[in-house]
């Protein structure tokens, strides 16, 4: 038994979609979450800067005595995950491989779409992972740089959000049967995305898929939390306005949380 928390990092609030699924599947595990909303989005930034910011988040989580770190950010996973994983002596998990694997299982016509930040798409990481596992699957990647600002400003239900999503996704409509939400912010726009793509297109939430792998690693390294603990205390940190973060988090997690401000 290991009651240390699991650390989550993201460029902002998007990683809460992963946390929500973890709380549902593994309610006995404690969480420490850091969202770098002050510097979001990461996607348009240079690779060197993204790596620098990611290491700052990692080092913050290490001060919280975490037993595992989850990159709840596709951009950070694409740029820095392998380096961090090779450096630390605790398990470090990214969201890309779980999402890629789920897409392969989902597609019936071998036509998969991937949407993500400009950096995630430019890295080509999803296509590489998918075609490594299933060479016959065709992958169409599309950068959607306007999605993260919509979520970070809590405008998911606005008319402008619907127009942006419709305009952004039009190149993929009718061409795929599976769509990977290759940014953990994007599930917060899921109803609009599904409406645009149509009911026949299966949406893959890479963050939610990641939770299954978290469970596997907890078992493998024998670092599961206390199954009998009914109430666990989570901690949430943001580099931006805690009130905005709290508002979005409370809606998504369906519970009121306390959010602390941190300067990195």
Swiss-Prot record:
Family statement drawn from the similarity comment of this UniProt entry: Belongs to the aspartate/glutamate racemases family.
Catalyzed reactions per annotation: L-glutamate = D-glutamate
Active site as annotated: 73 (proton donor/acceptor), 183 (proton donor/acceptor)
Enzyme Commission number(s) of this protein: 5.1.1.3
Name the record gives this protein: Glutamate racemase
One of the record's GO molecular function terms: glutamate racemase activity
Keywords for the protein's UniProt record, in alphabetical order: Cell shape, Cell wall biogenesis/degradation, Isomerase, Peptidoglycan synthesis
Keyword Plastid: no
Role according to the record: Provides the (R)-glutamate required for cell wall biosynthesis.
Organism: Streptococcus pyogenes serotype M6 (strain ATCC BAA-946 / MGAS10394)
Associated pathway: Cell wall biogenesis; peptidoglycan biosynthesis
Gene name tied to this protein: murI
Residues engaged in binding substrate: 10-11, 42-43, 74-75, 184-185
């Amino acid at each position: 038994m290991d009651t240390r928390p699991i650390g989550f990092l993201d460029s902002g609030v998007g990683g809460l979609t992963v946390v929500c699924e973890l709380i549902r599947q593994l309610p006995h595990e404690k969480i420490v979450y850091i969202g770098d909303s002050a510097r979001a989005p990461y996607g348009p930034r240079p690779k060197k800067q993204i790596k620098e910011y990611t290491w700052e988040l990692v080092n913050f989580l290490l001060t919280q005595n975490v037993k595992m770190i989850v990159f709840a950010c596709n951009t950070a996973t694409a740029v820095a995950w392998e380096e961090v994983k090779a450096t630390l002596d605790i398990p470090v998990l990214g969201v890309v491989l779980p999402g890629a694997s789920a897409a392969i299982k989902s597609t019936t016509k071998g036509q998969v779409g991937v949407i993500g930040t400009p950096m995630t798409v430019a890295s080509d990481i999803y296509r590489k992972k998918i075609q490594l596992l299933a060479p016959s699957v065709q992958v169409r990647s599309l950068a959607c740089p306007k999605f993260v600002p919509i979520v970070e400003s809590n405008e998911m239900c606005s008319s402008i959000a619907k127009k942006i999503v419709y305009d952004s996704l039009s190149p993929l409509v009718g061409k795929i049967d599976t769509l990977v939400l290759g940014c953990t912010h994007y599930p917060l726009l899921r109803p609009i995305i599904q409406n645009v793509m149509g009911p026949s297109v299966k949406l893959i939430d890479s963050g939610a898929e990641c939770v299954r792998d978290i469970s596997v690693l907890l078992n493998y390294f024998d670092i599961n939390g206390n199954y009998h603990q009914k109430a666990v205390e989570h901690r949430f940190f943001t580099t931006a306005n805690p009130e905005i973060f709290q508002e979005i988090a409370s809606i998504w997690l369906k519970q009121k949380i306390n959010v602390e401000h941190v300067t990195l």
